From Swiss-Prot:
Residue list for modification Phosphoserine: 384
Phylogenetic lineage: Eukaryota, Metazoa, Chordata, Craniata, Vertebrata
Coiled-coil zones: 8-259, 289-421, 493-621, 688-833
Superkingdom to which the source organism belongs: Eukaryota
PANTHER family associated with the record: GOLGIN SUBFAMILY A MEMBER 4-LIKE ISOFORM X1, JANUS KINASE AND MICROTUBULE-INTERACTING PROTEIN 3
Protein's organism: Mus musculus
Protein name as it appears in the record: Janus kinase and microtubule-interacting protein 3
């Protein structure tokens, strides 16, 4: 009766604690729902602004999502049915195997009982020494056989693992050598290309400087010749005036001769003067005509030289364009080599990861081998019925421990997923900080002296305001431009590095999950080394205590001369009772722990259901983001696509660029016009690059939205997994209940059958009372520990929930910042487009 009263009291305490825990859990749930409702209200205020932009894309996306959802649900149902069938088959096979094992163990126990009964009879007949020697020999032989078999198995496994390791190492060395050879080839090709590019640039610069000096020298010569020609033209004009004056005098003299009234004495003077003028004017006129002819010949020669120089300048411009084309082709050939190098580095990293996994697996197998050897050394043959029962109980305890460890590992995996997500976030933040520091360092650097190419050569002392006179190709790549291709390449490399790191982390996490699943399949459960060491130490301490007690009893019997058989039976019954009490305690603790885990799984399941409902409502209320961008067709420039999207179909960007190139090489234009044309071409190329960058940012934002949707799907998958885990833990709890009932029945039968009068003699009333008090104290202690553990788990769950909410807030803030950036980019692009359209209108 006292036992039943204690059991009812313990059940009442358990019910009270469970009720208290459920009430606390419901309060926490209510608080959590209030907090989440407030959060939803705040989010709804923010989502009102976002709803106006994304109504057009929502219908198409919902239609596609419905199709995909139908397909996914069908696939999920098929997979679930297949998994359930496989699980049912595995369960049936395990049940059959378990029943066969039980039958085999029962047969072994019966045989051992018969053999031990025969040995007891022989001992009673008076041949203890012979039996002991026979038992020792049999035990040694069996131990040797078992050890040899285990040794052979372990040696075979070690040899197989060594062979596999050698093969993997050889393959890895081959791959590493191939990677090194390919990397060396790529480096050599890269260096050759770089040297050729630098050489071509230097030659172009020298040729351009030489041509500019020649043009400047010829321009000066033309200026000097023009000045001389002007002087000579003035002299010829003076001579022409003198000639006209002499002609007038001659005409006057002739008129005077015709009129008779004129004096005669003036005639000789006039005629003499006319003759003198004729004689003096004819050689000067001849000299002027010779000089004019000579100057005309010089002018013709100079014009021919200028034409030759113009032709040579055109040829050099064509050569320059060809060299630029070759340089672009070399860059396009260099890009696939870089991509190939990246792929090879990725393969190398994957192989290193596989090698690490294989090494860790080898270490685990060697550790397991050592543990199996230690177990084989510890295992000994049971010498009596009590030892055999004890070994069976230990097996059952180990099986239950393995189940407990499996469930604990499931919880650890869920926590590891959260930790990996936090780690990925920290890596991304660190990459952002590094990029920001690089940009600050670049901005902090002093601007380099700009080399400006003028009409008369290169001017290194020109101010920054003389950008209008720069026509060289190199000035487009100075630090005065807002964003250079080197900066674009560095930013692209940084983005690729972050994406590579994220992919590597996800691959490592998936590989760890696969390795963990394989280990569970091979071992049949996880092994905790610390627990095994503790249990081993406890068993060794119990064995030592039992041995000392047996020695003390033997000494007491030798001294007192009492009956050995009665004392052995009494001791065996006492041990049996104590073991059964310990088993009941352990099973009660396991039952409480399993109940607590089931409750935790239910809470987590409810939280995930609430989260899924919240995400569905949010998706229903606030549709997805619509960026309203036109996709770029391959082969078309982004500026052309944008012009077509805006309705401007008259302008062809490629033809416009060709015309600008032709106008830039045209010698009929002035220097300022050539500079304006080249600057317009560079601005157009920069606008195309800017458009490409905007397209890349928009695609990255769309990828992030897809990632958020995949996280939502992951939440739903985790809910399904937790449902399955909850069912599994319920089944384990039911099995534990059944096992506890079986143990209680075994204890009751043992007390009924074996105890009798001897138990009454063994345990007095005081000892029974002490035992009841100890059991009640132990139950109170277990209940207090359970309460503390429940409170700790609740605290941990609340912390995890807060972390998840913080992550959701951070993601929403990131989305808002990205939306702002997109708006700013769109505004900047519209401003640029208007600016260029006005510039083209004014220029035309």
């Amino acid at each position: 009766m006292s036992k039943k009263g204690a059991g009812s009291r313990a059940k009442g305490d358990k019910a009270e604690t469970l009720a208290a825990l459920q009430a606390a859990n419901e309060e926490l749930r209510a608080k959590l729902t209030d907090i989440q409702i407030e959060l939803q209200q705040e989010k709804s205020k923010v989502s009102k602004v976002e709803r106006e932009k994304s109504q057009e894309l929502k219908q198409v996306r919902e239609h596609e999502q419905r199709k995909h959802a139908v397909l996914v649900t069908e696939l999920k149902t098929k997979l679930h049915e297949e998994k359930m069938k496989e699980l049912q088959a595995v369960r049936e096979a395990l049940l059959r195997q378990h029943e066969a094992e039980l039958l085999r163990v029962i047969k072994i126990k019966d045989n051992e009982n018969q053999r031990l009964q025969a040995l007891l009879n022989t001992l009673r007949d008076g041949a203890p020494d012979k039996v002991k020697t026979v038992l020792l020999c049999e035990a040694k032989e069996e131990a040797k056989k078992g050890f040899e078999v285990e040794k052979v198995k372990m040696q075979q496994e070690i040899s197989e693992l060594k062979g596999a390791k050698k093969q993997v190492e050889e393959a890895l060395t081959m791959v590493i050598q191939a990677d090194k050879i390919k990397a060396a080839e790529i480096r050599s090709v890269y260096h050759l290309h770089q040297e050729e590019i630098t050489r071509i640039k230097k030659e172009c610069e020298r040729e351009i400087r030489r041509l500019m000096e020649e043009i400047r020298f010829k321009d000066r010569a033309v200026f000097v010749l023009e000045r001389e020609l002007g002087v000579q033209a003035g002299h010829a004009q003076r001579l022409q005036l003198q000639k006209e004056a002499l002609d007038e005098q001659l005409s006057q003299a002739k008129e005077a001769e015709r009129h008779p009234g004129s004096p005669r004495r003036e005639l000789p003077y006039a005629s003499g003067a006319g003759d003198a003028s004729d004689h003096s004017g004819s050689p000067e006129q001849q000299l002027d005509e010779k000089d004019a002819r000579r100057f005309q010949l010089k002018i013709a020669e100079l014009s021919a030289i200028i034409r030759k120089l113009e032709d040579r300048n055109a040829l050099l411009s064509e050569e320059r364009n060809e060299l630029l084309k070759r340089l672009r082709e070399a860059e396009s050939q260099y890009k696939p080599l870089l991509d190939k190098n990246k792929r090879l580095t990725r393969k190398n990293e994957d192989l290193s990861h596989t090698l690490r996994r294989i090494e860790s697996k080898l270490k685990f197998v060697t550790q397991e081998n050592i543990e199996m050897r230690q177990r084989a050394g510890i295992i000994r043959r049971p010498s009596s019925l009590n030892d055999l029962d004890q070994s069976q109980d230990e097996r059952e305890i180990d099986f239950l421990k393995l189940q407990i460890v499996e469930q604990q590992n499931l919880i650890d995996e869920l926590s590891k997923t959260l930790e990996t997500a936090g780690y990925v976030k920290s890596v991304l933040e660190r990459d952002k900080l590094l990029r920001y520091r690089k940009q600050r360092k670049k901005m902090a650097k002093l601007p380099k002296p700009v080399v400006v190419e003028t009409f008369f050569g290169y001017d290194e002392e020109a101010s920054l305001e003389s950008d209008g006179s720069s026509i060289s190709y190199q000035t487009d790549r100075t630090d005065q431009t807002p964003c250079t291709p080197e900066d674009d390449l560095e930013e692209g490399m940084a983005k690729e590095e972050t994406e590579l790191r994220f992919r590597q982390l996800t691959m490592e996490y998936q590989a760890l999950q696969r390795a963990y699943a394989l280990l569970q399949e091979q071992v049949g459960g996880t092994l905790d080394a610390e627990r095994e060491v503790k249990t081993r130490e406890q068993l060794q301490a119990e064995i030592q205590r039992a041995q000392t007690r047996v020695e003390d009893l033997e000494k007491a019997l030798a001294e007192q001369g009492q009956d050995m058989k009665w004392i052995e039976e009494k001791q065996a019954l006492y041990r049996r009772n104590q073991e059964l009490v310990e088993k009941i305690k352990q099973m009660e603790t396991e039952e409480a722990r399993l109940k607590h885990e089931v409750q935790d799984a239910k809470d987590q399941n409810e939280l995930l259901e609430f989260r899924i409902l919240e995400l569905e409502e949010r998706e229903r209320k606030s549709p997805a983001i619509n960026f309203h961008h036109t996709p770029f067709v391959d082969g078309k420039s982004p500026l052309q696509v944008y012009c077509e999207a805006e309705g401007v179909t008259d302008i062809l960007v490629t033809e416009l660029m060709k015309k600008l190139d032709i106008l830039g090489d045209n010698a009929n234009l002035t220097n300022e016009e050539q500079v304006v044309v080249i600057q317009a071409r560079t601005v157009l190329t920069l606008a195309e690059k800017w458009l490409q960058r905007i397209e890349e940012t928009e695609s990255a934002l769309q990828r992030k939205m897809v990632d958020l949707e995949s996280e939502k799907e992951l939440f739903s998958k985790q809910k399904g997994y937790l449902d399955e885990e909850l069912d599994y833990r319920k089944q384990a709890l039911d099995q534990a209940h059944k096992h506890i009932l079986e143990l209680e029945a075994m204890l009751y039968d043992a007390l009924q059958q074996e105890a009798g009068a001897k138990v009454a003699e063994l345990l007095s009333e005081e000892e029974r009372e002490k035992l009841k008090v100890a059991v009640e104290q132990w139950k109170r202690q277990v209940m207090s520990e359970l309460r503390e553990r429940d409170a700790q788990i609740l605290r941990e769950r609340m912390e995890l929930l807060q972390i998840a909410q913080q992550r959701i807030k951070e993601l929403e803030e990131r989305i808002e910042t990205q939306k702002r950036q997109i708006k700013e980019l769109e505004e900047k692009f519209l401003f640029l487009f208007l600016f260029f359209s006005l510039a083209f209108i004014l220029w035309s």
